[in-house]
Amino acid sequence: MSLLTEVETYVLSIIPSGPLKAEIAQRLEDVFAGKNTDLEVLMEWLKTRPILSPLTKGILGFVFTLTVPSERGLQRRRFVQNALNGNGDPNNMDKAVKLYRKLKREITFHGAKEISLSYSAGALASCMGLIYNRMGAVTTEVAFGLVCATCEQIADSQHRSHRQMVTTTNPLIRHENRMVLASTTAKAMEQMAGSSEQAAEAMEVASQARQMVQAMRTIGTHPSSSAGLKNDLLENLQAYQKRMGVQMQRFK
């Protein structure tokens, strides 16, 4: 796996699924391929994206700044600086300075990532802030190692939280989660349908699923009533894909 592929993988792992994630993936690909060369326009686009947390925007801004060539005097962006200040916690800043001193002696991506993984996400963000604000300088490879370690820390905590939700025994949460997943699958079917001949059938199935979810939410139902809803919808989606000759196992 190339360095930039690894960076893209880690950064995308902390972004919630949806159309915005696909858009960000495309921007990262363009930036890494040297196609998107206007940093000002890119940062303005990033600043106005909805849904993303300030820290995620800060990390993306840091990656764009590292990758896109820019003029020396280009102003640093406030939204990135604020996101990478470690919540203003002096403890994070102290740790960030110690980490920075270690990273300065490091020259490889993997070495930097290993060192960084023993620090908290707050300290890692503060260290990125030091580099972003030009208070310290490290090689691009080392900076990317720091980025990937930060994303790994964040993704780990997101995964723990997600696992807790998936394994929860609370029937109300499980019920709502099934309905949300059914809605998301319906949306995916509508997007895949496009203008094909079978599109009408796919749209019909998706529409029925949405109406069912809406009705269940409106009138309130027993928590077990949604158990088969997502599975039925996935079966319909896979049958539709087979007829279309499309294999998209990732919807499982």
Curated annotation (Swiss-Prot):
Its main location: virion. Coiled coil: none annotated. SUPFAM superfamilies: Influenza virus matrix protein M1 (SSF48145). It is found in: Virion membrane; Host nucleus. One of its GO terms (biological process) is viral budding from plasma membrane. Residues 1-164 are annotated as: Membrane-binding. Disulfide bonds: none annotated. Signal peptide: none annotated. A motif (Nuclear localization signal) lies at residues 101-105. It comes from the Viruses. Residues 165-252 are annotated as: RNP-binding. One of its GO terms (cellular component) is virion membrane. Keywords: Host nucleus, Membrane, RNA-binding, Viral matrix protein, Virion. The keyword Secreted does not apply. It holds the Pfam family Flu_M1_C. GO terms for molecular function: RNA binding; structural constituent of virion. It is a peripheral membrane protein. Plays critical roles in virus replication, from virus entry and uncoating to assembly and budding of the virus particle. M1 binding to ribonucleocapsids (RNPs) in nucleus seems to inhibit viral transcription. Interaction of viral NEP with M1-RNP is thought to promote nuclear export of the complex, which is targeted to the virion assembly site at the apical plasma membrane in polarized epithelial cells. Interactions with NA and HA may bring M1, a non-raft-associated protein, into lipid rafts. Forms a continuous shell on the inner side of the lipid bilayer in virion, where it binds the RNP. Determines the virion's shape: spherical or filamentous. Clinical isolates of influenza are characterized by the presence of significant proportion of filamentous virions, whereas after multiple passage on eggs or cell culture, virions have only spherical morphology. Filamentous virions are thought to be important to infect neighboring cells, and spherical virions more suited to spread through aerosol between hosts organisms. Belongs to the influenza viruses Matrix protein M1 family. Homodimer and homomultimer. Interacts with NEP. Binds ribonucleocapsid by both interacting with genomic RNA and NP protein. May interact with HA and NA. Cannot bind NP without genomic RNA. Most abundant protein in virion. When expressed alone can form virus-like particles in transfected cells. This is Matrix protein 1. The gene is M.
